């Protein structure tokens, strides 16, 4: 049998309620099993992103609370350090509190990964989604 460690985490009530609804909907036997699956998915995504190499093109979508302490300024400051890979940006106001920033990128996968990691670590950022592809000339016929 696999050795298990017991941990304790703090979550916002609304987030836990939504997670519990998904647990019930998917028929999990326990909250712990659902959390293990979520952690496995997170690890797989992390490994995939960190295995990318070579020239890539894609987008980084960032949802953030624009009321959070200077998050917009920090996002802009970070972007200025990656002008070698940023092709364009699009800013969308989602509601009174939240914005979506989509950053189109093209360049070395390592630089794209660095930019994604820096944006993910910012306080006030709610979600970051990276979508990458190989440039057209590298797609097999």
Swiss-Prot record:
<feature type="binding site">
    <location>
        <position position="99"/>
    </location>
    <ligand>
        <name>Ni(2+)</name>
    </ligand>
</feature>
<dbReference type="Pfam" id="PF01402">
    <property type="entry name" value="RHH_1"/>
</dbReference>
<dbReference type="GO" id="GO:0016151">
    <property type="term" value="F:nickel cation binding"/>
</dbReference>
<comment type="subunit">
    <text>Homotetramer.</text>
</comment>
<comment type="function">
    <text>Transcriptional regulator.</text>
</comment>
<feature type="binding site">
    <location>
        <position position="91"/>
    </location>
    <ligand>
        <name>Ni(2+)</name>
    </ligand>
</feature>
<keyword id="KW-0533">Nickel</keyword>
<dbReference type="GO" id="GO:0003677">
    <property type="term" value="F:DNA binding"/>
</dbReference>
<keyword id="KW-0479">Metal-binding</keyword>
<dbReference type="InterPro" id="IPR022988">
    <property type="entry name" value="Ni_resp_reg_NikR"/>
</dbReference>
<dbReference type="InterPro" id="IPR010985">
    <property type="entry name" value="Ribbon_hlx_hlx"/>
</dbReference>
<comment type="similarity">
    <text>Belongs to the transcriptional regulatory CopG/NikR family.</text>
</comment>
<dbReference type="InterPro" id="IPR050192">
    <property type="entry name" value="CopG/NikR_regulator"/>
</dbReference>
<keyword id="KW-0805">Transcription regulation</keyword>
<dbReference type="InterPro" id="IPR045865">
    <property type="entry name" value="ACT-like_dom_sf"/>
</dbReference>
<dbReference type="InterPro" id="IPR002145">
    <property type="entry name" value="CopG"/>
</dbReference>
<dbReference type="InterPro" id="IPR027271">
    <property type="entry name" value="Acetolactate_synth/TF_NikR_C"/>
</dbReference>
<dbReference type="InterPro" id="IPR013321">
    <property type="entry name" value="Arc_rbn_hlx_hlx"/>
</dbReference>
<keyword id="KW-0804">Transcription</keyword>
<feature type="binding site">
    <location>
        <position position="80"/>
    </location>
    <ligand>
        <name>Ni(2+)</name>
    </ligand>
</feature>
<dbReference type="GO" id="GO:0003700">
    <property type="term" value="F:DNA-binding transcription factor activity"/>
</dbReference>
<dbReference type="Pfam" id="PF08753">
    <property type="entry name" value="NikR_C"/>
</dbReference>
<dbReference type="GO" id="GO:0010045">
    <property type="term" value="P:response to nickel cation"/>
</dbReference>
<keyword id="KW-0238">DNA-binding</keyword>
<feature type="binding site">
    <location>
        <position position="93"/>
    </location>
    <ligand>
        <name>Ni(2+)</name>
    </ligand>
</feature>
<dbReference type="GO" id="GO:0006355">
    <property type="term" value="P:regulation of DNA-templated transcription"/>
</dbReference>
<dbReference type="InterPro" id="IPR014864">
    <property type="entry name" value="TF_NikR_Ni-bd_C"/>
</dbReference>
<protein>
    <recommendedName>
        <fullName>Putative nickel-responsive regulator</fullName>
    </recommendedName>
</protein>
């Amino acid at each position: 049998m696999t050795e298990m460690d017991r941990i304790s985490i703090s979550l916002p009530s609304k987030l836990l309620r939504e997670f519990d609804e998904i647990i019930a909907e998917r028929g999990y036997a326990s909250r712990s099993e659902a959390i293990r699956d979520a952690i496995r998915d997170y690890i797989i995504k992390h490994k995939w992103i960190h295995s990318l190499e070579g020239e890539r093109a894609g987008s980084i979508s960032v949802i953030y609370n624009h009321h959070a302490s200077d998050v917009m300024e920090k996002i802009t400051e970070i972007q200025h350090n990656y002008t070698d890979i940023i092709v364009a940006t699009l800013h969308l106001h989602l509601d009174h509190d939240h914005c979506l920033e989509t950053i189109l990128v093209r360049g070395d996968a390592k630089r794209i990964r660095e930019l994604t990691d820096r944006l993910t670590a910012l306080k006030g950022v709610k979600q970051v989604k990276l979508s990458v592809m190989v440039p057209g000339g590298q797609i097999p016929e």
